[in-house]
Amino acid sequence: MGCIHGNECAGLPIIAQLRRSAPIAGVELWLVPSVNPDGWRAHTRGNAHGVDLNRNFSVAWRRIPRSSRYSSGPRPFSEPESRVVRALVTRMTPSLSIWFHQPERNVRDADRSPQAQRYARIVGLPFLPLVTPPGTATAWTKANVRGAQAFVVELASGPLSVTQVRRHVRAVRTAAASEAGLNPAEN
């Protein structure tokens, strides 16, 4: 997922490059450039209603007021964008989801999965355990797709260099191949 917060879209070139990459035999990649097109256009964290979509999922949801930059919306899945993500994830049941954010420069996973740790090594970012905020897409995915892994890649502020994009593409492809039981070195 390239961009759930409209002002954190450095993942878009990674998604674009993955789309241009050769397919990995035996792997189905679903690439979503932006979950938040209104926020992306306005360069805001929230959507057109000012809701932080990554606080609008039902797992551990709690109401966060509209005055906060982390506004959760009036109820879980109140926003059309989070409902679309829910429908996609429910339909596709991905075994692995990677969510790009900015600007903390790390890879985070509450479960400390080997996939997330390997991703961090490939791209040269620190791995940190994720303290999961309320109502996040990653927590919802893990709770609703049996055996699913979902983690956060926090990119640096500003655009990525061509070299950085290539590293992230390699890391995504390695994670996808590994998740499918393939030899990551061959992909």
Residue positions per predicted region:
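Active-site-adjacent mobile loop/cap segments within catalytic or ligand-binding domains
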Residues: 109, 135-187
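Active-site/substrate-binding loop(s) of hydrolase catalytic cores
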Residues: 1, 7-132, 155-157, 181
